[in-house]
């Protein structure tokens, strides 16, 4: 069921989303070659704590037999890893890596979700273009995140923009509603038909998240039960924000 947030709930969402944005700011300022993904995870956890929040991801139970609850405060995915990479003291970030960090701050019972792909050191032109296209895909999508439009309008805009740039969108994972729960209705694919899906109403809070692959759209899951990689080894990028549907233009809650 899609939830329409009250004025009070929207204020609580803004608070949680501000923590998410501040946490990404701390990561952006700190990330460099030689750090481990666990180092980044610790920075995120400490920053969320500083602002009165906790990670909604840590301890998350996917409800899949044999897959343990998620062990970290962030998902950190490097190069050909698309999403859900598990931070590790053994995983060292190198010059030229693109590093996707997805995090959800939980504060006062509400969630703020955002992902960024960070370019570390001397990144190739191809990698830089992928990251830039992925970010722009988000902004192409939210042009249609307006009262009276439909979910499919957002999905179509993202998918078509990515296609025209010569890349592929991930089809098995998607954006989602967000609020008291990290994942709420509706699902928001990164491809689809304009004019389809539920109508957008003021008070909806949505996590829009293009996940873009340089090569073919096929993906694989690693044995850890979490990490998703590209099947062909090509690079992947991820850009996400939590937005609010209003009477006019959408409000992006996870950008400072």
Describe these PLM feature segments.
Residues 1-256:
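Active-site neighborhoods and metal-handling regions in enzymes and metal-associated proteins
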